[in-house]
Amino acid sequence: MQPSTLQALAKRALATQHVSKDDYYILERCGLWWHEAPISIYIDDDNQIMIRTLCFKEGIKLNTALVLAVKENNEDLIMLFTEWGANINYGLLFINNEHTRNLCRKLGAKEELETSEILRFFFETKCKITSSNVILCHELFSNNPFLQNVNMVDLRMIIYWELKDLPTNSMLNEISFSEMLTKYWYGIAVKYNLKEAIQYFCQEYRHFDEWRLICALSFNNVFDLHEICNTTKIHMSINKMMELACMRDNNFLTIYYCFALGANANRAMLISVKNFCIENMFFCMDLGANVIEHSKTLADIYGYSIIVNILSLKIYKANPILLSKETNPEKINTLLKNYYSKNMLAYDICCIDNYL
C-alpha cells in the first residue's frame, strides 16, 4: 500500500536511506525517531515493510510497530505508520486511554476486532523467530487484558499444537491464559535457542526454571540443557530427565547428555519403545542398552509389530565412539549432528540382504 500523502511518501523514502549520525537531527525533526534513535525501513522477502530501530535491530513488521506505538500512546507514529499502510484496526488490542481510541477512530478503526482478526495478527507478529520479537510478543500478548475478554479457544488449540512434543502439554489446561502464553513464548525461545530471549525469561520468571528444563530436554537443545545443569539447581532426577528426552523421536543430543550424566540407557530404551520412538530405540542400543527381550515384550503389549520384528534380530551392540560420556555441548553437537545409528544401519543392511 502506498502512503496516503506526499509528506508520508517523502518520510518513507527518507527512512530507506543511510543517514550519518551527524544528520540524525533531520530524522528527528521529520518524526523518524523512536526510543531515542532513528527509524529506518526495509522490504523483506515477502514484500512487507519492516521497521528497524535501536530496540529492534532485526526489524519488526509495520503492523507490529503500529500496535506498539498505540500501546505507548505515540500519536505521531500512530499516524505515520497508518499512512504507510499499517492496519489501524489492530491498534484496538492495545488501546489504554480514550484519547488514543478517538485518534484510532479518526484514522478509520472500527469499534472491536473479530476473533479471526486477532488470530491473524497473532500469526503475523509471531512468525519472525528472533529474540527481540519473541520478547515483544510476550509483552504484547501475555498480559493483555483485551485477550482475556475474547473466546480464545482457537488460540489455545494453536498453542497446544505447537507444543505438542512436550510431555506436559496437558498441564497447560490447568493454568491461566496469561501464564500459558508466557510459557509458550519461553518454550519458543528454548526451542530455537534464542539466547537473549532465554536470558530474559530466566531473569523474569525464576519460578519457570523447571519449564525451561522440560523444553530443553524435549526440544533437543543440548546447549541450553548444559547451561541449566551448570547454573541452576535442578529438582529432577537424571532418569526423569532422560525420560523427558526420550518422549520425542530423534532427540539424540539431549538423550546423550543425560546418558553422559549417568542416566540408565536400558530404562531409556524401554521408554522409547513405549512411545514408539524407533530412532531413539536404536540410539539407546548404540549407547549400550541391551534389554532386547523386555523391549520386545513391551512392544508386543502395545501392538508395535514393527518393533517386535526389529528386535527379533540378534545383531545389535554398542557403538564404542559413544561411550566416552562427553558433556561438552559443542563436542556432542559435532559428534551427533549428522549421526546415523550404527544399529539402524545394521538393521538396514540385514533387510537388504534378506530382500536380495
Swiss-Prot record:
Any single Pfam family the record assigns to this protein: ASFV_360
ANK repeats: 61-93
Keyword Cytoplasm: no
Biological process terms in GO annotation: taxis
Highest taxon of source: Viruses
Keywords linked to the UniProt accession: ANK repeat
Protein family according to the UniProt entry: Belongs to the asfivirus MGF 360 family.
Function: Plays a role in virus cell tropism, and may be required for efficient virus replication in macrophages.
Name used for this protein in its record: Protein MGF 360-3L
Native organism: African swine fever virus (strain Badajoz 1971 Vero-adapted) (Ba71V)
